[in-house]
């Protein structure tokens, strides 16, 4: 307790007169007043400095206060002309809507030409302050508040924090609806600039945008981003979610930025574009719209959740990192080069393959929704680890291709290419549902021999319909007679409306192989046969002899032999040459007589199967 007034007399020019008052046990009671004379300075740092008398600050005198560390009360407080009130606003933990610096029983009088000066070491040099100090409406308190909440024309939403400095905002930020705002601020958007760190440790309610231009923004409470419309992260900026859940409308991040999920949960109601880095663990949930990810996220080990009606688009393995994908909407994998998909993908959503590259999937592909191969190739597993894709519907578009080992659990629609060929024949692709041909192409490899020749096969457990072209590559074999043929397509269900059409000629040795539907109980299957007809299998019946498909070139071989046999036939007289004689009358040498050889032949032949017929006409003169 101090009894009496404290007076700092006026001092001459270049003199000093300073007083520092600190509180003891959070309270300093002075039974008197405080008069600060011309040129003198008083530093008050007590949180509860109470003067029972009056406080006056003369011309060129100053009072120095710190926000959060000073709360000075007096009967009356007067700041005279050209007096100075210096306020340090460098409070690191802003946990109140406002801080009271001065309070008075009867009022605070501030001369028009007095000076209230704020300084803040947390601010980047030259930056606008986020703090505003003024009298309250009753003129009995001098308070400092966040300019965010100022409704008198100075509202401001930018926090420009100096490098290595940290500011924690622990009060809730709501929309400032005042028509008078500073420097074009919309009253509802937060901007973090400067290379320092801003922490939002309260649940907020603002509805504008959140933009991190530089430095770090740390979220230390649920919904610290309020109801943010757009979240912008500029190059070099970082957002640390610090384990808390947040919901925003749209995410827009630039290359070189970092979004650290850090065990938190970020919900996007309208997708966005992510060119920066996503790191940490936790979850990123897409409730609606499309999120297009192009950044390197190899350090993200969390979960992407794509909800119904939402869309996630990625183009490289790094875009997904090592994250799981729980897909109930649409996932687009746009690969322009080879991509071994190692991420676990589940859910009943649809998967779209675009881009000219090949996508190789293994047993981590657990989705059950539709798979649409629009461009490029989807490769199922490998020879040692075949994959049965769980999709209920696989669509191969005109520029798409399905290949590999295993099959699809559901239906298959083919407008593009289904490629069963590998390094050797014998691959089997299984369709668990129905197959629909839409003028697509099936590629097979076959050894051209008898019925038991090695071949690739398409096995359809359900029904088959539509038209499909089939191209067969010969993989060895010298040709042989077939009985039923080499089965290449097997349909367990109905195939009445299916048509598989051979695209190119298949020859081996003396045989032509053709693709033909089976007969009788085999009428739902397609075979490569070297026979003209497939017999209808009868129980306990002995197969009849049937003619095989002979190559038409054989007829030309026979005709060539016949021509060669006639071409060089001559007679004895021709071999002897012409006879010469000398005329008795003239003594000249002459040729004797005339000689001619004329021979013609006509022949016809055919094989006993009547497949090959040849006719030859030969004339020799």
Where are these regions (language model features)?
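Short secondary-structure subsegments characteristic of cysteine-rich extracellular domains
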Residues: 213-214, 479-494, 610-621
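Extracellular beta-solenoid/beta-roll
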Residues: 1-81, 98-125, 200, 234, ...
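Outer membrane beta-barrel translocator domains of Type V secretion systems
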Residues: 199, 537-621
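Transmembrane beta-strand segments of Gram-negative outer membrane beta-barrel proteins
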Residues: 157-167, 171, 332, 339, ...
């Amino acid at each position: 307790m101090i009894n009496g007034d404290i007076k700092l007399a006026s001092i001459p020019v270049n003199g000093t007169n300073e007083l520092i008052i600190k509180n003891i046990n959070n309270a300093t009671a002075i039974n008197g007043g405080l008069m600060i004379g011309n040129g003198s300075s008083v530093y008050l740092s007590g949180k509860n400095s109470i003067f029972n008398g009056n406080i006056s600050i003369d011309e060129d005198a100053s009072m120095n206060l710190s926000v959060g560390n000073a709360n000075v009360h007096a009967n009356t407080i007067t700041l005279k002309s050209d007096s100075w009130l210096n306020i340090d606003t460098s409070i690191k933990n802003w946990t109140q809507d406002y801080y009271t610096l001065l309070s008075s029983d009867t009022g605070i009088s501030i001369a028009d030409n007095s000076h209230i000066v704020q300084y803040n070491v947390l601010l980047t040099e030259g930056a606008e302050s986020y703090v505003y100090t003024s009298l309250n409406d009753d003129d009995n308190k001098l308070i400092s508040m966040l300019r965010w909440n100022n409704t008198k024309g100075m509202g401001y939403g930018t926090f420009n924090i100096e490098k290595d400095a940290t500011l924690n905002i622990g009060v809730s930020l709501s929309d400032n609806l005042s028509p008078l705002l500073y420097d074009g601020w919309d009253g509802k958007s937060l901007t973090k600039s400067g290379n320092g760190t801003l922490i939002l440790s309260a649940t907020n309610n603002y509805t504008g945008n959140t933009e991190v231009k530089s430095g770090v923004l740390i979220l230390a409470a649920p919904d610290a981003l309020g109801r943010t419309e757009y979240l912008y992260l500029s190059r070099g900026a970082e957002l640390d979610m610090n384990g808390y859940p947040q919901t925003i409308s749209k995410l827009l991040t630039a290359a070189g930025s970092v979004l650290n999920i850090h065990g938190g949960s970020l919900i996007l109601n309208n997708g966005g574009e992510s060119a920066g880095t996503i790191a940490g663990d936790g979850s990123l949930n897409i409730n609606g719209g499309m999120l297009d990810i192009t950044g390197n996220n190899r350090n993200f080990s969390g979960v992407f959740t794509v909800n119904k009606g939402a869309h996630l688009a990625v183009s490289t393995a790094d875009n997904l990192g090592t994250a799981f994908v729980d897909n109930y909407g649409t996932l687009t994998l746009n690969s322009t080069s080879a991509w071994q998909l190692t991420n676990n993908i589940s859910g009943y959503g649809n998967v779209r393959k675009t881009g000219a590259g090949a996508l190789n999937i293994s047993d981590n592909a657990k989705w059950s929704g539709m798979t649409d191969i629009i461009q490029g190739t989807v490769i199922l597993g490998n020879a040692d680890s075949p994959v049965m894709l769980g999709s209920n519907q696989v669509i191969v578009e005109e520029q798409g291709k399905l290949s590999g080992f295993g099959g699809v659990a559901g239906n298959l629609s083919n407008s593009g290419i289904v490629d069963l060929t590998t390094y050797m024949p014998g691959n089997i692709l299984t369709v668990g549902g129905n197959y629909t041909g839409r003028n697509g192409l099936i590629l097979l490899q076959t050894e051209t021999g008898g019925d038991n020749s090695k071949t690739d096969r398409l096995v359809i457990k359900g029904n088959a319909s539509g038209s499909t072209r089939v191209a067969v590559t010969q993989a060895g074999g010298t040709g042989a007679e077939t009985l039923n043929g080499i089965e290449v397509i097997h349909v367990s269900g109905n195939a009445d409306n299916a048509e598989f059409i051979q695209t190119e000629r298949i020859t081996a040795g003396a045989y032509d192989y053709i693709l033909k539907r089976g007969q009788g109980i085999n009428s739902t299957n397609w075979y490569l046969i070297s026979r003209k007809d497939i017999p209808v299998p009868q129980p306990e019946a002995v197969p009849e002899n049937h003619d095989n498909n002979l190559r038409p070139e054989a007829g030309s071989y026979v005709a060539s032999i016949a021509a060669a046999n006639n071409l060089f036939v001559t007679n004895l007289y021709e071999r002897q040459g012409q006879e010469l004689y000398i005329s008795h009358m003239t003594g000249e040498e002459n040729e004797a007589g005339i000689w001619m050889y004329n021979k013609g032949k006509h022949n016809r032949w055919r094989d006993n199967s009547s497949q090959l017929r040849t006719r030859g006409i030969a004339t020799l003169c």
